[in-house]
Curated annotation (Swiss-Prot):
Mitochondrial intermembrane topological segments: 62-111
Transmembrane annotation, as ranges: 37-61
Family the entry assigns: Belongs to the cytochrome c oxidase subunit 6A family.
Keyword Acyltransferase recorded: no
Top-level taxon of origin: Eukaryota
GO cellular component, one term: respiratory chain complex IV
Protein name: Cytochrome c oxidase subunit 6A1, mitochondrial
UniProt-listed GO biological process terms: mitochondrial electron transport, cytochrome c to oxygen
Stretches in topological domain Mitochondrial matrix: 27-36
Organism placement in taxonomy: Eukaryota, Metazoa, Chordata, Craniata, Vertebrata
Function: Component of the cytochrome c oxidase, the last enzyme in the mitochondrial electron transport chain which drives oxidative phosphorylation. The respiratory chain contains 3 multisubunit complexes succinate dehydrogenase (complex II, CII), ubiquinol-cytochrome c oxidoreductase (cytochrome b-c1 complex, complex III, CIII) and cytochrome c oxidase (complex IV, CIV), that cooperate to transfer electrons derived from NADH and succinate to molecular oxygen, creating an electrochemical gradient over the inner membrane that drives transmembrane transport and the ATP synthase.
Gene for this chain: Cox6a1
Source organism of this protein record: Rattus norvegicus (Rat)
Length: 111
């Protein structure tokens, strides 16, 4: 096994010396601006736009999905503790309060 690896490295070394080297093919200046623009254009058309389309389809399908019933309210003593009122509104509702999904310390509002 070791001899096969050693002989393969010798062959690749001989081939590498035999081939002429033209410029610096791995340097940053080796690629032109046309190639870079072509890559970004391809990424836009084949990655970004289909990604936006799939995201739009996902939003559309989620909007048509039926609503789930909310969980039953259980007044756990370690949740929804109000030691001082919130500085907005009546002081009992969070800033982005949703009466259907976010219960107050006493339960849901719309029950």
């Amino acid at each position: 096994m070791a001899s096969a690896v050693l002989s393969a490295s010798r062959v690749s070394g001989l081939l590498g010396r035999a081939l002429p080297r033209v410029g610096r093919p791995m340097s940053s200046g080796a690629h032109g601006e046309e190639g870079s623009a072509r890559i970004w254009k391809a990424l836009t058309y084949f990655v970004a736009l289909p990604g936006v389309g799939v995201s739009m389809l996902n939003v559309f399908l989620k909007s048509r999905h039926e609503e789930h019933e909310r969980p039953e309210f259980v007044a756990y003593p370690h949740l929804r503790i109000r030691t001082k009122p919130f500085p907005w509104g009546d002081g009992n509702h969070t800033l982005f309060h949703n009466p259907h999904m976010n219960p107050l310390p006493t339960g849901y509002e719309d029950e």
